[in-house]
Swiss-Prot record:
Membership in a protein family: Belongs to the PIAS family.
Domain notes per entry: The LXXLL motif is a coregulator signature that is essential for transcriptional corepression.
Organism: Homo sapiens
Pfam families (UniProt xref): PINIT, SAP, zf-MIZ
Name this polypeptide is given: E3 SUMO-protein ligase PIAS4
Domain PINIT: 119-279
Encoding gene per record: PIAS4
Domain SAP: 12-46
Amino acid sequence: MAAELVEAKNMVMSFRVSDLQMLLGFVGRSKSGLKHELVTRALQLVQFDCSPELFKKIKELYETRYAKKNSEPAPQPHRPLDPLTMHSTYDRAGAVPRTPLAGPNIDYPVLYGKYLNGLGRLPAKTLKPEVRLVKLPFFNMLDELLKPTELVPQNNEKLQESPCIFALTPRQVELIRNSRELQPGVKAVQVVLRICYSDTSCPQEDQYPPNIAVKVNHSYCSVPGYYPSNKPGVEPKRPCRPINLTHLMYLSSATNRITVTWGNYGKSYSVALYLVRQLTSSELLQRLKTIGVKHPELCKALVKEKLRLDPDSEIATTGVRVSLICPLVKMRLSVPCRAETCAHLQCFDAVFYLQMNEKKPTWMCPVCDKPAPYDQLIIDGLLSKILSECEDADEIEYLVDGSWCPIRAEKERSCSPQGAILVLGPSDANGLLPAPSVNGSGALGSTGGGGPVGSMENGKPGADVVDLTLDSSSSSEDEEEEEEEEEDEDEEGPRPKRRCPFQKGLVPAC
């Protein structure tokens, strides 16, 4: 039954407009519309209501058409069609054929054997160049199931639907089943849907149309949501990535039906289907280490080129500093890399760069904020060698001759004079410091007494002690009191010691 179904669909795809109208009229369906609408209607009829009478009618129309073709004289030259591109062979008036579908000697099932891996309702323009999508480093393409095909609105409604019926080959099914799981329920080999603008000027990045919804067979597929935005008035952004359809598909020879719902707001979009193998950041890092290491001598020549004297410049550069700290994570570099298109010598860590782009792909250099795609990344062999040789520095300087020297942080030097160290003891009850005395080793010890006292040791003047806790007024008053006391002692003799008043409410500090 499956073989007959595939054969019937191949026959339907070879029909002219008149054949399609006869087939649809045979089952009582509408015969109006463009050719791609009639083809879609007939394919849906074959897919969901293929009775023996309908199959007999399809075969009769097919044999009638090719019997007439074979009886004709030599055909006009024609251009063969790409089996993966769905082109409308008639203009919008439905009268003038643009390109003949096939010649009489072409086996039509062979020509259209791959058409089931395409969108029956999504015609592409033959005269326009093909839409190209950018390569995704984390997705290694195995097969192209459907080339980028434009989403064509069928009416004036804002919400459009475009169905697709396709089947996987046994080899493709085997690849998916035998692939490892990246995480529970997610295979490494996947069937992904990619959507982009229909712009042929340059490779296009993935871009979703408004109100997008993807239905695979009888279940809706999850589409990445919007990033939360805290800024008022700023439209939230959406990560546009390939949509994995594998978990909702029939992994057998049965046909799969995909329906893309999208908002028609003036912009043109194209869709494509690919069989891919998803890679991890560690696999990309290993590949980069294998094919992306730049020889140290080439890196050294680049340093010389950067520091070469420019005769037109009035400023001569004698060296350039390069940090060994990754600007992404502020940690020491382990795998220094940069893009070949970058003008700077500063590197970032390839490990963290790949991990960050695996979560949120931007592929922007963290040093110069310019594009740094994966296929332009290189590992700096010279800086890798420096990292292994210089483990105690966080920065180096490249010199004019290509050599380098580490830049280490200078130790703080003491600005105190090279003299005797003054030992300041605790103050007595009157707030006076004991006078220091110089011992034999040059250190000063504390002795009883108050006030600044100078000492002589081996004919050299001693150091003065200044109490920094007292202000200038209090120190001058203390000096006057001491002078008065000394005069009184000289005249009247020694006076009794004063007793320091002690308040009961005070608590000692120790």
